[in-house]
């Protein structure tokens, strides 16, 4: 279990995160959702260890990691821009981290991930030859071969089109279930968060607005911000889609 206890973070005298407390269960998919500037990326960086915690504590399976360096936490991230090496092919990118830790994944385990993520036919391609969805899968595979204790994903679907987006969502779910891997995702899109996650953490102005299962958030929003930020967006999207089909029926 990952426990965040009364986390506070400020930059230049501005409070970015204010008294954040929550638990994330082993194997759970949790999305951190909020508008731009809400503090969600800062929270992800605090968990990863890129950014120091000012006040409060971060505990993983009973061990206090608050002052533990990023390299010793065992958490891995897939960045929004994938951060792949353009001079290497897909397979070389996937296995790059094993140069420093050669025994962490066996050849069979690497092959299993390649099959799971549908990358077999793309292994010899350079990164520039891959589509956005293929790059995302390579980045996922590269992270997974390092056997992270927690998988962090920063806006993993933002640059993908609809069909590819659904495919990547399914693969993220499969990875979390197959490996019983705690997965934390940052997103600004309510639909992504609600359809991908076991629970959703909604942040507004550095504070927790609501933390619960998707159905709880939809059916029992805690405050007006939840209704306006989430439910209104979903309602607008639904009405737009409905109007398109209505136009098609009357054309």
Model-derived regions: residue spans:
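The feature captures the beta-strand-to-loop junction immediately N-terminal to the Walker
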Residues: 33-35
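Conserved ABC ATPase "signature" region
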Residues: 105-122, 173-174
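Conserved ABC ATPase signature
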Residues: 126-130, 134
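A short, proline-enriched helix->beta-strand linker immediately N-terminal to the Walker B motif
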Residues: 145-149
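ABC ATPase "signature
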Residues: 211-212, 220
């Amino acid at each position: 279990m990952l426990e965040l206890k009364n986390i506070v973070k400020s930059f230049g005298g501005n409070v970015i995160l204010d008294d954040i407390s929550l638990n994330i269960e082993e194997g759970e998919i949790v999305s951190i959702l909020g508008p731009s500037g809400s503090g969600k990326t800062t929270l992800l960086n605090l968990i990863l260890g890129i950014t120091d915690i000012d006040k409060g504590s971060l505990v993983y399976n009973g061990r206090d990691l608050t002052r533990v360096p990023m390299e010793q936490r065992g958490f891995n991230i897939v960045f929004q821009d994938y951060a792949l090496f353009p001079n290497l092919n897909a397979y070389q990118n996937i296995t790059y981290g094993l140069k420093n830790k050669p025994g962490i994944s066996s050849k069979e385990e690497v092959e299993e991930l390649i099959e799971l993520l549908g990358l077999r036919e793309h292994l010899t391609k350079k990164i520039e030859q891959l589509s956005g969805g293929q790059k995302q899968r390579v980045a996922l595979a590269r992270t997974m071969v390092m056997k992270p204790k927690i998988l962090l994903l920063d806006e993993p679907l933002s640059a993908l089109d609809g069909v590819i987006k659904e495919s990547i969502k399914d693969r993220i779910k499969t990875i979390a279930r197959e490996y019983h891997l705690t997965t934390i995702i940052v997103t600004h899109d309510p639909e992504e968060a609600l359809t991908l996650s076991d629970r959703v953490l909604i942040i507004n102005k550095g504070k927790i607005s609501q933390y619960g299962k998707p159905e709880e958030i939809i059916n029992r929003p805690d405050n007006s911000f939840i209704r306006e930020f989430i439910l209104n967006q979903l309602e607008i999207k639904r009405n737009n889609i409905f109007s398109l089909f209505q136009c098609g029926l009357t054309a």
